[in-house]
Design a protein with these regions (language model features):
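Aromatic "clamp/platform" in nucleotide-sugar-dependent glycosyltransferases that forms part
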Residues: 247
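A short, active-site helix/loop in glycosyltransferases that binds the activated sugar's phosphate group
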Residues: 109-147
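Glycosyltransferase donor-sugar binding loop
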Residues: 41, 168, 195-209, 225
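Conserved donor-binding/catalytic core segment of Leloir-type glycosyltransferases
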Residues: 158-175, 181-184, 197-199
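Nucleotide-activated donor-binding/catalytic signature segment of Leloir-type glycosyltransferases, i.e.
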Residues: 209-227
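Short alpha-helical donor nucleotide-sugar binding micro-motif in glycosyltransferases
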Residues: 226-227, 234-239
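A charged, aromatic-enriched C-terminal amphipathic alpha-helix characteristic of glycosyltransferases
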Residues: 14-18, 301-334
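Short hydrophobic beta-strand element within catalytic cores of glycosyltransferases
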Residues: 264-267
Length: 345
C-alpha cells in the first residue's frame, strides 16, 4: 500500500511526530510505501498537490482536529479513504469545545475508521458518547528506543548520587510544568537534595516565557530544551524518576519508553497515565499536589526506586505495525461505516 500519514505542524520531537515516525518505520518494514506530511490548521495551497503527487491508497490522520480539519478543507474531494487517530487533546478537550466538537465529529463521520491510543479513554468515550464509539477494537502500542548517546547528568552538571527527576513534555499549560515547580518548592524547603529537569519543545510562547522565568529562580531545577527522540532513551537511563504532570493525557510516548526501560514513573492520576502506570509496581500515581509531594518524597529513597524498576516488555512495535496494516487494508477496502479502534496501553 501507499500510505500517507498526516500530522499537525509541530516540533519534530513532539509526541505526534514520534508516533508518526514509529508508524512509518513499522509499516515500511512490512513492505509499504509511507510518507509523512505535516499541515497547519489553516492548510496550505501546496498540500493537495503533494497528496496528489504521492497518490496514496489510504491516509492516516494523527489528531482529529489539527490534522482532520485541514484534511476536510484541502483533500476531502480527492476521495482517499482516511483513518483518524484521536489524541488525548481531541477527546479530553476538543469534543467539549464548541469551536472544535462539530469539526471533530465531521472528521469521524467521514473516516473509514477511527483509532484511540488508550483503552480506558475508549471505554469512557463509549459510555459518554456512544454514537461515536461503536465496534471497539484494541491496537497494542509499540515502543522503538533510540540509540543515540546523551549524558543527561553531564549536561546538567548533576552528581551521580543526586536523585534526578526528569519531566519530558512539550511546554504548554496542559502539561503542568509550572505547577510541578511549585510542588517541588515544598520538597526543596524541607532540605531534601534532588534535581528536577525538564526537556521538550516550547509549544506555547507566553507559558514558555513564564516557565523559563520560574526556572531561573530555582537552583535545583533546569530546562535543557529539546532532546532528540533518538537520544531520549539514553537521557532517561540517567534519570532516577520520569514525571508526567499533565492535567489530561492520551498515551504519552515518554511514559511508554520509561516503562519499557524500567525507570520508575511519578504521574498524575488521569486515564492516560493510569493505562501505563501500575501504582506501587512500576511507578506512583497522585491525585493532587499534596499527594504528589508525598510520592516524590518516597522516591528520594534509592532502595524504593529499585523496587519499582520493572521493565515492561509488552510494547511490541511489530505487533503494532501488523495491527495498523490490518486496519489500513480494511480502510482501502472501504468499510462504509466508521469504526472506533482503541489501542491499548
Amino acid at each position: 500500500m501507499r500510505i500517507l500519514i498526516v500530522v499537525p505542524q509541530q516540533d519534530h520531537a513532539s509526541g505526534n511526530w514520534v508516533t508518526a515516525r514509529r508508524f512509518q518505520q513499522g509499516l515500511e518494514k512490512l513492505g509499504h510505501r509511507v510518507i509523512i506530511l505535516e499541515i497547519t490548521l489553516q492548510g496550505e495551497a501546496s498540500f493537495q498537490g503533494k497528496v496528489i503527487d504521492f497518490a496514496p491508497d489510504v491516509a492516516l490522520l494523527l489528531h482529529a482536529y489539527r490534522s482532520g480539519k485541514p484534511w476536510l478543507e484541502n483533500a476531502r474531494d480527492l476521495m482517499i479513504p482516511a483513518v483518524v487517530m484521536l489524541t488525548g487533546t481531541d477527546v479530553n478537550h476538543g469534543l467539549d469545545d464548541p469551536q472544535q466538537s462539530g469539526i471533530i465529529q465531521a472528521v469521524i463521520e467521514q473516516a473509514v475508521c477511527v483509532m484511540l491510543q488508550n483503552p480506558i479513554i475508549a471505554n469512557a468515550l463509549s459510555r459518554n458518547r456512544p454514537t461515536l464509539a461503536t465496534g471497539l477494537k484494541t491496537v497494542p502500542p509499540g515502543v522503538i528506543l533510540g540509540h543515540e548517546i546523551f549524558d543527561l547528568r553531564a549536561t546538567l552538571g548533576v552528581a551521580q548520587e543526586l536523585p534526578l527527576f526528569l519531566m519530558p513534555a512539550g511546554v504548554r499549560p496542559v502539561k503542568g510544568a509550572i505547577g510541578l515547580l511549585k510542588i517541588f518548592d515544598q520538597l526543596a524547603a524541607k532540605g531534601d537534595s534532588f534535581h528536577l529537569a525538564f526537556c521538550g519543545p516550547l509549544l506555547d510562547e507566553d507559558y514558555g516565557r513564564r516557565f523559563r522565568a520560574e526556572i531561573e529562580t530555582r537552583p535545583w531545577a533546569s530546562y535543557i530544551g529539546v532532546i532528540p527522540p533518538e537520544a531520549m532513551a539514553a537521557a532517561m537511563r540517567s534519570a532516577d524518576v520520569i514525571i508526567n504532570n499533565s492535567i489530561s493525557e492520551g498515551l504519552a510516548n515518554s511514559l511508554l519508553e520509561a516503562a519499557t526501560l524500567g525507570i520508575p514513573i511519578l504521574a498524575r492520576n488521569n486515564p492516560g497515565n493510569a493505562a501505563l502506570v501500575r501504582h506501587d509496581v512500576n511507578g506512583l500515581l497522585y491525585d493532587d499536589d499534596n499527594s504528589c509531594l508525598r510520592q516524590a518524597t518516597r522516591l528520594l529513597k534509592k532502595e524504593y526506586r529499585l523496587q519499582l524498576s520493572r521493565p515492561e516488555r509488552s510494547y511490541n512495535p511489530d505487533m503494532e505495525a501488523k495491527t495498523l496494516e490490518a486496519i489500513l487494508t480494511e480502510a482501502v477496502n472501504h468499510q462504509p461505516k466508521a469504526q472506533i479502534i482503541a489501542s491499548s496501553g
